[in-house]
Amino acid sequence: MGEISPAPDNLLNRDFSAHEPNKKWLTDITEFQIPAGKVYLSPMIDCFDGMVVSWSIGTRPDAELVNTMLDAAIETVTATGGRPVVHSDRGGHYRWLGWLSRIADAKLVRSMSRKGCSPDNAACESFFGRLKNELFYPRDWLSTSIEEFIAAVDAYIRWYNESRIKASLGLRSPIQYRKNLGIAA
């Protein structure tokens, strides 16, 4: 059986470092199973400092989920003319026409992991692990609605960007780090 569209080369080759913002972005989808149902998160993560540039959360892992996230990410670089490499796994979401046309229209560069090789997107997987260890696993979600859970994930990501310190950033959050460098409002 043929592929949806040809996969681009793996341009990152597990080099998740970037010396400035908006050079390398990572994306993927993760699933949360709570008693009320399944919820999916699609973030765009900047390799410069781990900032979650944009994200979408929904109840279906579909094209709308990833396209909404990509549109929001593109808006963050439109004014500066940034053209990051966008690295993903080989999921169909990243190979459908809607995704491809958005990438092409914004003049972004596609990169994909090798087939079945999750370490090729390890930094994104690491973010998912951190989020689940800090937010998801410690709590009982039994009486939580889908809407409440989505709000909790959204709040976590905002907290992560604004307040969660990282040793690699000199004990600053991504936004604090950027402010310290004079590259964030």
Q: Model segments located where?
A:
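Charged DNA-binding/catalytic regions of mobile-element recombinases
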Residues: 1-185
